[in-house]
Amino acid sequence: MASEAPPFWWEEPDWKVLALSPLSAVYALVAGRVMRRARREKIEAPVLCVGNFTVGGTGKTPVAIALAQQAKRMQLKPGFLSRGHGGSFAEPHVVDAHHDAAKHVGDEPLLLAEHAPVAVTPNRAAGARLLMAKHGCDFLIMDDGFQSARIHIDYALIVVDARYGIGNGRVIPGGPLRAKIVDQLVFTSGLLKMGEGTAADAVVRQAARAGRPIFEARAEPISKAGLAGKRFLAFAGIGHPDKFFDTVREAGGEVVLSKPFPDHHFYAEDELAELAAVARAEGLGLITTAKDAARLRHGASQDFLNRLEVLEIDTVFELDHAPERIIEETLDAWRQRKLRS
């Protein structure tokens, strides 16, 4: 199931925002109350949540992967908790990166599963117990679920895209916010500003005034080799496809044609056939994101996959010690929780 944020969410407020204000006010009231009153189950392992304030992509999954890699360097055994966008399992399911399809577990869990065990379930606490019992995980990283998960979070790292910030600053449906910033900041442990830009400056200052530590990071291609001088038809079904197109250019590729699709889009045969035909006619290579490639593994022909280049992304923190600090502060909060119980 694909989703696409309305363009006006990322623009200056207009009449549409005004018309939706009553609904936004109701949504904000309910969302804030849910966050404040939710019963969150405490589990035996520390829980680090990588979330965001808004609907849409902010680069959480590469951040979660980077933190899992840091946890491994600290001799921990990380595991991921994910709802799994579009997933179809009623009970907690541990993802098999080689055999599971994105339509069953979601695209992001397939990427996460290449680095650590992943439990897909809306019941994060049940998923946590499964990972601890069957895989010996002793450090759990939750990809999303900041506002809704019914599990105690020891550290909530909120990722904000520097290019888009929090959009028009309004709550759903008038804007991209999942709840009022003041309500979300209460449960925020730290804020990570991703990339370059000034759109997030206001919320960064607000978080800093609230005493939350501010981290910075950027997304970098894992390998730029082979892209320089190549001409591409780039396509992507992610939160902000234009960010991907820019990354291809920054890596040395020439984006001659670009085709955006809705976030989490599952490609139909005729769409893939059209992409391949246009690329062939124009003498272009095909390039897409790792998330899109995960969705295509069980849906595209082998010929299409053989022609496709995938741009892998890594999260690079501005301060080398930042990931270690985040892990340590999660562990400290967990130890304090254990002492109080």
UniProtKB/Swiss-Prot annotation:
For binding ATP, which residues are annotated in this chain's numbering? 54-61
Is the keyword Transmembrane in the record? no
Enzyme class of the recorded protein, top EC level:
transferase
The intrachain disulfides are none
Care to name a GO molecular-function term for this sequence?
tetraacyldisaccharide 4'-kinase activity
Its UniProt entry gives the catalysed reaction(s) as: a lipid A disaccharide + ATP = a lipid IVA + ADP + H(+)
| Coiled-coil residues | none
NCBIfam families from the xrefs? lpxK (TIGR00682)
Explain the purpose of this protein.
Transfers the gamma-phosphate of ATP to the 4'-position of a tetraacyldisaccharide 1-phosphate intermediate (termed DS-1-P) to form tetraacyldisaccharide 1,4'-bis-phosphate (lipid IVA).
Alphabetized PANTHER family for the sequence: TETRAACYLDISACCHARIDE 4'-KINASE (PTHR42724), TETRAACYLDISACCHARIDE 4'-KINASE, MITOCHONDRIAL-RELATED (PTHR42724:SF1)
Task: Report the family membership.
Answer: Belongs to the LpxK family.
- Its protein name is Tetraacyldisaccharide 4'-kinase
